[in-house]
Amino acid sequence: KLVSSSDLSSGLAVICAWASWNYESTDQLRYIQRAQKKSQGRLKTVSISVDASRRDCKNVLDRDSISWPNICDGKIFESKPIQLLGLTSVPDNILIKNGKIIARSLSTADLQDTIEKNL
């Protein structure tokens, strides 16, 4: 599925960078998945994997039943979306409300608090 900026221009959205080899980032993905289910569609999500292997990325997405749009082009941190968004580590994230960035690079605990306050 293609995602455009207009898909993220209303309501609350999170863009997150993750990797299969980084436990903290896969844990953050699972938290976002729970928050998305709890929000009943009010939290939009796009994730970007920095895995070199698309298979490793797909294995995590399948294992955790993650179905939102995910980008995994195998280019690690050279990936165009990673560079354009200024994501520099894993986990990393950008929280957007009504088309405006309200937070970035939050820890999982801070991401959780900020999502709950803004839903």
Predicted region positions:
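N-proximal helix/coil linker or "cap" segments that precede and/or mark the start of modular domains
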Residues: 1, 6-10, 55, 59-62
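Proteins that catalyze or organize thiol-disulfide redox chemistry
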Residues: 1-2, 7, 112, 117-119
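Short active-site neighborhood of thiol/selenol oxidoreductases, capturing the structured segment around
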Residues: 3-26, 32, 44
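Conserved hydrophobic packing residues within short motifs/helices of P-loop NTPase cores
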Residues: 15, 46-48, 71
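Signature tryptophan residues that serve as conserved aromatic anchors
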Residues: 18-21, 57, 68
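Solvent-exposed loop/turn segments at secondary-structure junctions
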Residues: 20-22, 51-54, 101
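Structural microenvironment flanking redox-active thiols in thiol-disulfide oxidoreductases
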Residues: 26-64, 76-82
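Thiol/disulfide oxidoreductase modules built on the thioredoxin-like
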Residues: 66, 73-118
